[in-house]
Amino acid sequence: MSKFVFVTGGVVSSVGKGITVASLGNILKSRGLSVSVQKLDPYLNVDPGTMSPYQHGEVFVTQDGAETDLDLGSYERFIDIELTADSTVTSGQVYSEVINKERRGDYLGGTIQVVPHVTQEIKARIQRLADRSKADVVIVEVGGTVGDIEGQPFLEAIRQMRNDMGRDNVIYIHVTLLPYIQSTQELKTKPTQHSVNELRRIGIQPDIIVCRADYPISEGIRDKLSLFCDVERKAVIFMPTVSTIYEVPLKLESEGVGDLLVSRLHLNASPSDLSIWRGLVEKIKEPTPAVRIALVGKYVELKDAYYSVRESLCHAAIHNGRDIQIDWVYAEDIEKNGPEEYLKHVQGIIIPGGFGIRGIEGMITAVKYARENGIPYLGLCLGMQVMVIEFARHVLQSDKAHSTEFEPDSPYPVIDLLPEQRGVDSKGGTMRLGNYPCVIQPGTMAGQAYGNKLINERHRHRFEFNNDYRDTLSKAGMVFSGLSPDGKLVEICEVSGHPFMVGSQFHPEFLSRPNRPHPLFREFINAAKKVIRDGEQPSLPLSP
C-alpha cells in the first residue's frame, strides 16, 4: 500500500512548494523508494490548456497528452520519472465529474454537497494514482495558499485521508515564508503561526514545517515555531534561498527531511545516496564561461511561460561545461527595430512555441538573421514553423509563403492545419498532444544528436508542415530529418550547410533532465559555444 505525503503552502503563493515537492521525491528516490506525484489545482478550469501564458505560465504536457501545470515538469526533472494525466487534478475536473454523476443518477437522488461528494471525488483521484502507479510514496501538492476559498474542499479531502488510510500512512508538510523586516533586520514568524493555526482549524496538524527565507534563520526561530506550531523541533526545517534550484534536495536532506519521512511513514528504505546529484550541483557552481542565447518569444515578460525551455538550456550548458546567459527578446521589438540591436552579440537563437500572429514577422526576421549569419538556431514547434516560412520566403523567393494559422487564404501555405483538426471547433484538449514516434534520418544533424533511429517526443500543436511543398524545399536545401513512421508528417527539419539550424514540431524541452540533457538542446549549445562574437562572454549564474 502506498504512503502519502501532502504538501500545503502558507503566507504567500510562489513560495517554492513545487520545487520542495520535487526535491522530496528526489530524496525518497535516492533511498531506493518508488515515487509518484500529484498536483491538486483549485482553479475551475478543467486544465490550463486554454489559459493565457500570462495567467498561468507554461503548459506542461505529459506522455499521455495531459495539459498540466508547470510544476509537473519540475517533478519529472528532479525525480527523473514520467507522469500521466492521473498526476493532475483540478476543481474543474472534479466538479464536472460530480455533476455528470448526478445527471446519470449515480447518487440515487441524494442532495449533492461539497462534503461528502466533492471530497470523495478528490480522494478517489488521489487513490487512483496510488493504485495505478503502485508507488511506495505518493506526494500530493495542494496548489494555492491555505485560506483560499477555492482550496477548502481539497484541504478537507486530505484531512480525511489520514483517517481513511491510517495515521502511519499519511504525513502533512507545510511550506511557508518567513518575511524579513528591513527596518528591524529580523525574520518574522507570526505569519507562519497564523497559517498553521488556519490549517489546524480545518483539522490538519502539520508534521513538518519547511520555512523559506532569504536570510539566515536562527535556532531561536526554530524553537519558537516548534512551540507555537506544536511541531517537533527537528521537524522545523530551514530552506534558505540558494543559487540554483538543484541544490534544494541537498539542503533538505542536510536538514534531516529524508530521515523524518522514513521514520514517520515507517518506510523500508535504503541509506540515502545523493552523490550523483551532489556532483551535478558542484558542476553547476563551477565558474565557467557563459554561452549567450537569445530566446525570441511572444510572452517573454513572464519567463515562466518558457520554464522548461529555460531549464533545458541550463541542462545543456551544464553538459557542455558552460554557464548560460539568456537574452529575453520580445519578437515585436525585432519587428519594430530590426534584429541587429538584439541579436548581434548572441551565440545562438532559440524560438519556442506559441499561438497567434502577434510577433510572427519578428520571429521570421530572427530566423533569417540566424540563417544568413551562421548563428546556431533551434526552433521548437512554432519555432520550426517560422523557420520553414522564412526558408520558403527568402531562399525560394516565395514572399507569399505563410501558415494558414495566420493567413487562412495564403496562396503558399507551407504550414497547414493537421487533417484531423479540420472541423474541430472546441479548443480544450483537442490538439495533437503527448508522445508520438519519430524516425530519424541518418547522416543528419538530428541523427548525430540522437544516435537512435526511432525516438518518442511530446507534441502540442494543431498545425504541421504542408507536404505539398516537401520536394520543392528539399531541392532548395532543407532537410527533413525526422518523420512519422508512416512518412506523412514532418517532425524535424534542418538547413544543410549551416553550423546548426534545426526545427522540431515537437517539444523536446519536456524530456530534458539536469543529468541527461535533451540531445537537440545539447548539440545546440555545443554549436553555440563555438561561436565567438565580441569575445568570450562573462561568467553568469546558471539559474536565471
From Swiss-Prot:
Residues 299-534 form the Glutamine amidotransferase type-1 domain. Allosterically activated by GTP, when glutamine is the substrate; GTP has no effect on the reaction when ammonia is the substrate. The allosteric effector GTP functions by stabilizing the protein conformation that binds the tetrahedral intermediate(s) formed during glutamine hydrolysis. Inhibited by the product CTP, via allosteric rather than competitive inhibition. UTP binds at S13, K188, T189, K190, P191, T192, Q193, K224. The keyword Protein biosynthesis does not apply. The keyword Ligase applies. ATP binds at S14, V15, G16, K17, G18, I19, D71. It catalyses: UTP + L-glutamine + ATP + H2O = CTP + L-glutamate + ADP + phosphate + 2 H(+); L-glutamine + H2O = L-glutamate + NH4(+); UTP + NH4(+) + ATP = CTP + ADP + phosphate + 2 H(+). L-glutamine binds at Y54, G354, L382, G383, M384, Q385, E405, R462. Its EC number is 6.3.4.2. HAMAP family: PyrG (MF_01227). This is CTP synthase. The gene is pyrG.
